[in-house]
Amino acid sequence: GLWLYEAMAGRPFGGEVRSLSAETLRRRFPDFRKDGLRGALRYVDAQVRYPERLVVELMTDAVHAGASCDIGVRVEALIRDNSEIVGVELSDGRLLYAPLIINAAGHWVDQLMQRSESRARPMLHTTRGSHIMLPRRAGHPASGLYVQARSDGRPFFLIPWGDSLWVGTTDIYHEQPDHWYATEEEIDYLLDEANQLLPTADYKHDDIILTRAGIRPLVRKSGPRIKEGAVSRAHQVIGPRDARGEPGLINLLGGKLTTHRSLAEETVRKAMKILGVKRSHSTRSKSVVLPELTDADRPEGLDKTLFERVARVYGPYGRDIFDLIRTDESLAAPLVEGLPIIKGEIVHATSMEFAATLDDLFARRCMLTTEDLPWHERTRELAEAVGELLHWSDQECDEQHTTWLKALKQH
């Protein structure tokens, strides 16, 4: 299977699939469990260090290309004219009409359909996947490990992430679309499997840096309910003339970040065919260069360590932050002393990246909450520093802080 993967991928990242003997594994991974070790296959893949920022940058690039973006506005229901979908009703009271509506609500696809038509049949199987982040200790692997979990045979992985390890995953049916988090049972399972894979680690609950959970919007098939791991990961784009389709509507079922570009292309092509529109431009980006930041980009007065963090987190988009600093040198200062976030990041996130809450800022823009840093004890100080920079009232600062603490419980 991996050789087929390599052939289809064309080895875009270098390296090649090859087998490793048990002896080689013991030498390369001395902390790896010894019993039952027969060998392994090695392959090369890409890693998105900050998937949250990838999504944000896709959104801002779309806006720069002419799209509209309404943060914090929910589609309450679809508007029907007889049997055809003709528009949407928004949570702020607006009614928007269009010749074609695309329901790309992820794991909320069914909820939107059922709010619009109570008899709508579910199209998704939703499962929860949870992960924990642990410190990567001396002697632990610098490359990812993908094995079968000892307790249940599920796919299980440890993936290096900076100085940490992402450990996952679980696969559990989840029916509540608005609330999800890693349960204690899942955390215990992940800790136990990590310790079995790396027996010398002896990880404890106190070692957990953070948890992450998400909901997979998997396509529901007819027939009896099957085991979570057996549900197909293939996506579907359902148009008006497809089975389960409705006039005026495209439903996106399934999909994930890995395939977001091809899924978007497939959806847009279907929409253009429905609307009778011909493509005038190609979005192929093989020749687009995304230059990395160099020391020549560092504004005068910005600490080199802080510059390097901005370069790592934002890539070429960091130039927008540096432009702000060149206009106002005070934005090069740390937001709070002792944490590597500068004031310019906050201004950039709120003025150019649609950040509206503290959770937006620190979990999906500045990425502070994914760092193994002592920010947990300083949430109030961080909230007040942001409030001062953005001229929040005391009441707004209190409300933002309270909302952030609630959001952190789901991390």
Regions found by a protein language model. Name each.
Residues 68-70, 209:
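General small-molecule cofactor/ligand-binding pocket signal
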Residues 71-86:
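A conserved short coil-to-beta-strand element within the FAD-binding core of flavoproteins
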Residues 372-375, 391-411:
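C-terminal amphipathic alpha-helical interaction region
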Residues 6-10, 26-65, 87, 170-178, ...:
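Helix-loop-beta segment of a Rossmann-like dinucleotide-binding subdomain
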Residues 17, 53, 61, 114, ...:
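C-terminal catalytic lobe of FAD-dependent flavoproteins
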Residues 1-28, 156, 307, 316:
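Dinucleotide-binding Rossmann-like beta1-alpha1 core, especially the glycine-rich loop
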Residues 91-100:
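Core beta-strand elements of the Rossmann-like FAD/NAD(P) dinucleotide-binding domain
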Residues 105-106:
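Glycine-rich, N-terminal phosphate-binding loop of Rossmann-like dinucleotide-binding domains
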